[in-house]
Amino acid sequence: MSLNSSLSCRKELSNLTEEEGGEGGVIITQFIAIIVITIFVCLGNLVIVVTLYKKSYLLTLSNKFVFSLTLSNFLLSVLVLPFVVTSSIRREWIFGVVWCNFSALLYLLISSASMLTLGVIAIDRYYAVLYPMVYPMKITGNRAVMALVYIWLHSLIGCLPPLFGWSSVEFDEFKWMCVAAWHREPGYTAFWQIWCALFPFLVMLVCYGFIFRVARVKARKVHCGTVVIVEEDAQRTGRKNSSTSTSSSGSRRNAFQGVVYSANQCKALITILVVLGAFMVTWGPYMVVIASEALWGKSSVSPSLETWATWLSFASAVCHPLIYGLWNKTVRKELLGMCFGDRYYREPFVQRQRTSRLFSISNRITDLGLSPHLTALMAGGQPLGHSSSTGDTGFSCSQDSGTDMMLLEDYTSDDNPPSHCTCPPKRRSSVTFEDEVEQIKEAAKNSILHVKAEVHKSLDSYAASLAKAIEAEAKINLFGEEALPGVLVTARTVPGGGFGGRRGSRTLVSQRLQLQSIEEGDVLAAEQR
């Protein structure tokens, strides 16, 4: 009996040791995971905040929302996540009741503000793409500030009720932090989900849905990479008659002009899917978990699922600087330039200022229905020349585009695509008669813009010459002929009282003749004399 009892005791002790060892391994793994998430959240959002703050030309109206988003995520990594790391090891809250309530409020406030900011960014892109002409009047600096203030007030309204009796705050050992007791007040759980999560998600769905529809209309393609243009004989019909069909074999040389690869539509679709997918993947499980706790009790959700859902909600703060910050080519180049100096390409200051001004109308997505010249004039800049970001395929590429959407415009150009835009190879395509009329009108507008630019250039040159002549005449009247630069007058005199420098006298005579001719508006006559 004693031998059997000792054997059973040894087995129980070994089982307890194995369980403790397994639990200790899980705790260590979870501790390492939450530390990695905290480091990525802190560093990722910090570099975007510093880049936007140091490079003031990047802080456009659209990027102000990104700045607010990344700054709030950085505060989350500093004020909330370190206490989550400590609680993941001890499995208890050791920082007191006051800080428990305050950390729960901070977590709800920052999370709600982040989700609402995503909705505001979607609205900003919606106006930039669908209404580019009225965008500068709709999205102004004051309205952007008002939108940011509204975001935080809206979030505060959704987070304060647990502190005033509607629901309560408690430490959740499986979430490793103090949160609202979702299982105690189903009404507050539903209110917070609708007020702070469902509302911005629906706004994102509607806005990005309209944006993608505009991209499809502008691209005039049904599927990415599988649509071809069929052009019949122009001699029989008298004009081009085009129709679309699905590419199957590609063997008919005269019928098919080639496959048009709608890279812009694919890019728009991928960007929208990434934005919406990141939101649903990171916040969807957490919303399902707290809804299950509110409806069927806290025991209805497994502890591991509760932990993973909380991790994913933290991971959303890692996705935001990647999607809305580092995906921006200009921000990425400036960040690399700050880290590695001149080893990476950085645009000159003047070019950056002009690019930021021209494309401030749509900092995320390039305009769809406007030519580069009209975009430049609408933004208050100069008409774009051959260095425009529109290539021969009609793709509008902007380095200031945060998500780098390239959307097809209604026209094509014979110029070579710029080196900084990666556009598909040049392919011929047929157009309808109505499209030809639109292209002719657009070409006429562009030619008028070029003529006006040449006129302005000539007027500027004439004004500069006139100003120099007036300045020279004023110097002659005030200081004499020696004050003019380039007049070679020697100090010695020759018999007769004149100066020995004939070159200087000839220069003065020619300058006076040129001055008189400029005042009379006839420069060529002065040169002939």
UniProtKB/Swiss-Prot annotation:
InterPro entries named in the record: GPCR_Rhodpsn (IPR000276), GPCR_Rhodpsn_7TM (IPR017452)
Location (main, coarse): membrane
GO molecular function: G protein-coupled receptor activity
Domain of life where this protein originates: Eukaryota
Record GO biological process: adenylate cyclase-activating G protein-coupled receptor signaling pathway; G protein-coupled receptor signaling pathway; negative regulation of smoothened signaling pathway involved in dorsal/ventral neural tube patterning
Bilayer topology term: Multi-pass membrane protein
Glycosylation-annotated residues: N4, N15
Keywords: Cell membrane, Cell projection, Cilium, Developmental protein, Disulfide bond, G-protein coupled receptor, Glycoprotein, Membrane, Receptor, Transducer, Transmembrane, Transmembrane helix
CDD domains per record: 7tmA_GPR161
PANTHER family: G PROTEIN-COUPLED RECEPTOR, G-PROTEIN COUPLED RECEPTOR 161
Family, per entry: Belongs to the G-protein coupled receptor 1 family.
Disease involvement: Medulloblastoma: Malignant, invasive embryonal tumor of the cerebellum with a preferential manifestation in children.
Protein name per its UniProtKB record: G-protein coupled receptor 161
Organism of this sequence: Homo sapiens (Human)
